[in-house]
Amino acid sequence: MSETLATPPAALHTWLSRWRQFSALTKPRVVQLIVFCAAIGMLLAVPGWPSLPAWGVALAASIGIWLVASAAAAFNCLVEQTIDSKMKRTAWRPTAKGELSNTQTLSFAVLLCAAGMAVLWVWVNALTMWLTFATFVGYAVIYTVLLKPATPQNIVIGGASGAMPPVLGWAAMRGELGAEPWILCLIIFLWTPPHFWALALYRAEDYARAGLPMLPVTHGNDFTRLQILLYTFVLFAATLLPFVYGMSGWFYLVAACALGVGFCGHAFRLWRHYSEALARRTFRFSIWHLSLLFAALLLDHYLGPLLRGTP
């Protein structure tokens, strides 16, 4: 009797453990930022407050993009399991620890990708589906398989796929693309190198041990810090484009300038005097920078007309 009673809790524990392993493959925090950026693109694509049907499309698009992004993350874990096992930052991943087989991981990734593509095809539109699939290929194949192990410019070139979420969101709501989503894409594209290189600075030993040609490993600490500073300056200029192009108003411009000065300040201090603590702070600030920048753009989209006294 005692063994019978003990079975359900044990089975539940096993099921929960397996669920956590598959969930970890999807890199939830990264995917959350992807969906957030896509959602910003969706909301900016609609003048005023979205209608109820538009909210339905936005929900379906968010689910579809989330599924495909999760599939790309799982495929990345599959390909990089040997590399991940050599790095402290990633050694905990289920594939690196051998907790999930290659077949399980690949099947999971294919299932997620197929489900996401189906959602986008049925409830959103074909343009969004194909753009999302192209983004999947860009990250899972071009970046993960070809670029990351081959060149220190992997982050720069591969960053194009990571910059696509606002374009996907815009396409979902409009069914077409203009200049606006590509401006948002450019901002993320320029944000990606200083963001990841700040991380790579204090994880350089990890990357060297794994044999990955990240910029601090191939070109050294000083060169990487200079590149972070230069990219941050260019990024600052790019963040002003929504105002210049007429996508936003003064509220966004003030926020973009404040955040840009903050990011440049972190990059400048890191360039002048390196420390691991400074690199960590710069990395963390970069996340806040992008999140708050897009949040300010969204607030300006809705509050701007009220502040200007226009409907």
Swiss-Prot record:
Membrane topology: Multi-pass membrane protein
Catalytic reaction list: heme b + (2E,6E)-farnesyl diphosphate + H2O = Fe(II)-heme o + diphosphate
Gene Ontology CC annotations of this record: plasma membrane
EC number: 2.5.1.141
Any one Pfam family match given in the protein's UniProt record, by short name: UbiA
GO molecular function, one term: protoheme IX farnesyltransferase activity
Record's subcellular location: Cell inner membrane
UniProt keyword Transferase, yes or no: yes
Main location: membrane
Membrane-spanning residues: 30-50, 55-75, 108-128, 129-149, 153-173, 182-202, 233-253, 287-307
Keywords for this protein: Cell inner membrane, Cell membrane, Heme biosynthesis, Membrane, Transferase, Transmembrane, Transmembrane helix
Gene3D superfamilies: UbiA prenyltransferase
A biological process from GO: heme O biosynthetic process
InterPro entries the UniProt entry points to: Protohaem_IX_farnesylTrfase, UbiA_prenyltransferase, UbiA_prenylTrfase_CS, UbiA_sf
Recorded metabolic or biological pathway in which this protein acts: Porphyrin-containing compound metabolism; heme O biosynthesis; heme O from protoheme: step 1/1
Enzyme class at the top of the EC tree: transferase
PANTHER family: 4-HYDROXYBENZOATE SOLANESYLTRANSFERASE (PTHR43448:SF7), PROTOHEME IX FARNESYLTRANSFERASE, MITOCHONDRIAL (PTHR43448)
Family: Belongs to the UbiA prenyltransferase family. Protoheme IX farnesyltransferase subfamily.
Function: Converts heme B (protoheme IX) to heme O by substitution of the vinyl group on carbon 2 of heme B porphyrin ring with a hydroxyethyl farnesyl side group.
Miscellaneous information on this protein: Carbon 2 of the heme B porphyrin ring is defined according to the Fischer nomenclature.
HAMAP family in alphabetical order: CyoE_CtaB
Name assigned to this protein: Protoheme IX farnesyltransferase
Organism expressing this protein natively: Methylibium petroleiphilum (strain ATCC BAA-1232 / LMG 22953 / PM1)
Lineage: Bacteria, Pseudomonadati, Pseudomonadota, Betaproteobacteria, Burkholderiales
